[in-house]
Amino acid sequence: MNMKIKASLIVAVSCMAVVAASDFALAGKFNAYYTKIDSGEAFEKYCRTGAYADIVVDLANGAFVFWRGSSYIPYWQTREGRWFVDEVIERSGDGPVKRPDKVNTYSRVALVESGPDKAVVYWRYLPRFGGKNPHAGVDATKFVDEYFTITADGNVTRTIRQGTAKIDDWRDPGNKTVQTFRLTPDGIMDKKTQRPGLSGKAEAAKGAQVKANSVGNPVAWWKFDEAQGDVAVESVSGEKGTVEGHKSLWEKGVSGTALQFDGYNSIIRLSAARGPKVSSALTLEGWIAIGAYPWNWAPIVQQADDVPEELKQLKGRRAWLTGEEDQEEEDEEEEYFDFALKKENDVGYFLGIDGLGHPGLKVRVGQVWEELVSDTHLGRRRWYHIAGTYDKQSGKMNIYVDGKPAGERKVSKSDIILSSKDIKIGKGKPRRPIRPVRANTFVDFYSFDGLLDEVRIHDTALSAAEIARSYETFKPIEYDRDNPDMDKRVLPAGRSTGKFGAYYTHLKFYETWDNLWRFSEHPDIVVEFDEQPTKFVFWRGVGYIPMMVNEKRQWYSNEFNETWNKSGGQGCQEPMSDKESYTNHVRIIENTDARVVVHWRYPLVDVFHVIANYNEDTGWGDWSDWYYYIYPDGVAVKTMHLWTNGERNHEWQEGMAILGPDQHPEQVLETEPSLMLGDLKGNVERYNWVDGPPDDVDYDNKKIHVVNYKADYDPYTIGNFEGGNVYGGEVTDYAVFPSWNHWPVAQMPSDGRYASFPDRTAHSSLTHVWLPIYREDFSDRPYEQKIMMEGMSDKSPEELVPLAKSWLKPAKIKVESGCSSQGYDRSQRAYQLISQASKLSFIIDASENSPVVNPCFVIKKWDCPNNANLKINRGTIQSPKNLRQGIVRDTDGSRTLVVWLKITSVKPLNVSIATSEED
């Protein structure tokens, strides 16, 4: 589709922008910037977007525009008309034809590169979906990434990558439609399109030495020695089974190659018709290396009816917080919440691992589904041989680990009742994760997470001696046993450039998790510093919830907006629930030597993606736009903007330690003290968390909140706190801090699951602080806004007092000449000025009560393309690290100068700023 609007219609849209369409269409110079276009259309009356909703690229003869009114398919506008680019991939959703994504739930744009001669715009969208709230047909493998590279001479290269079921197809260099065209005064010309063509090439994995012998005569045997492709052969029947999931990941096994399962989607099937028939005896065996313990039972191999779980009742306590008033009486009979399930009553057989790392054998013997669970606990990242047997003659079930008995059970001497369903490897029936925190934990499919090799079925019960020989036959050497071919799982933290600034990147975690996603080169953002070893990380694995990372790669977050109760949906509605990053996203708005501005946008959804406080007429519910103003001293101020017409009982802050695999909470958090609260007079209260949470925490008059990490750099939060609390419940014997692993990274419909091991990413929630409203509105686009300062520092709470004062009680500014002042904007940690001449001078009236600490000056309408000369008290600043500046484009396309000074003062500062032509 190539839509054109002739010049006769331009009059109707000439007021289309905060910068009018007639203005940006004739700008005359190459320039790209964020803005918000106001076309006057009816949908904009209720549009819950901020000042950076759209992108304009100005060229000599017109403007190339990415507008939310078209769900961001761009158009070219000149004096002669308006032309949309081709809709190469057809779009349809919950909106009108022109704006198929009604409120752009899944459509967004980012300006990933902007220079004097070239701009690159990234457009991501879901081409087809249906329904309302929640939407139907939403799938992480179906998103489309488009890039537009626009040069100053009007040439455009457009690349289109469409989501694929298999990650290798997504990554294939041939999975790309490339279109080129020219932007001319008379329209879009010289279009050429090259369609995608997949290469289909795959390299074979390198395996161990193949061991061909087998103890006994298996009636089914998956050797997993294919080493490449999407087929695994059952070697007895010769039947080929498709390896289902995002990728067939072949790795070195105990013999030849093994197959790695991702914990969610991976599965191999063999039809019951081609499978072995067992009746009076059975042996199931296989080699496994666990990456993370299953959420619940996961099979190594099974043939079962997969009778659904039946819920008998809910039991246990609710969550609570110390400091809450009017707490409900707790059920003292149950220590924790849990689901009481009816006894499983399946048909067939099953060998697998439970959610706590114990191997188990289950068999339908006569009329009873018998279960044998070993007391042996299996470690992670180590090869084990697991075997289970049943023998009708002896009436015994046995289980073995590494060739040794690990459990037995006497059962009736009856035949095995065989299931008519497919044999499955790696994945069974949908289950609820074990150890739920609350009722909003739902049934879903999960698979084994780790490596599987040499899976065999026998129609006889191998003896203990034969099981031992089977183990010895395939046993790897000690080094290989303890170092299976799996990625180590370490939270990603970027490149460590040693420079201050932000960059887009594609952060890697571990391969089977990375394979779940269809993102191109720019999904994530990292902000780094040149004078301290901390970072801000905005990563899709945490739903882009902003993370502060210290020198020991320990993560912390002050979290997000959250609502519940009367907002619709199931349980908590929060960005944490967008586990697939369907909707949450981040963009770099500013990136200069003086500061970085990052925009994080998200809807408040439950685990089924039901948006809170949804209005069917407008399509809008609760959305948040958070803006991070990050400076070279490692300090960030965030403006938290929540759009809502619901009950205003949202959460705005939750202090959390984010834990990577193999990080226990008590390896990251100090217990003596854990929390420090300070006021502006330098008084600090310190709270221990030795045997559990403190119950005497007092937030009165406190402005500084520090969580004590086992590192030099600790996370701090500064604000006009109106109160707060400490998590006082949901503590288990795993740690003195409450710890859960339903988030981050986990792809499961749950808003609460207790951690039992440090096998997965997890988090420990510690505190809440309550903040005053900074701005609000109750009109057609109702919102609340609050602000907060945060960062990581090696300073004590007492040493943070000057910084807190400089922001909470900022020194006043007095203009002397050359500009007007809009005062100090606490939401940006910056003085706001409008230039009226080439030389500006003003006084910052610093004092003991209102000190200056590393101030920023934002000077709009800066007429010069170059940086400025600056003097303090008539002296120049010599060190470039003490004076940092940059020029950005405002939302009207004009220049803005941003200046940051590394200076602390309790005395007035005389500041003069001049263009380089002035001195």
Task: Locate the predicted segments by residue.
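Extracytoplasmic low-complexity segments
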Residues: 204-265, 283, 293-298, 303-306, ...
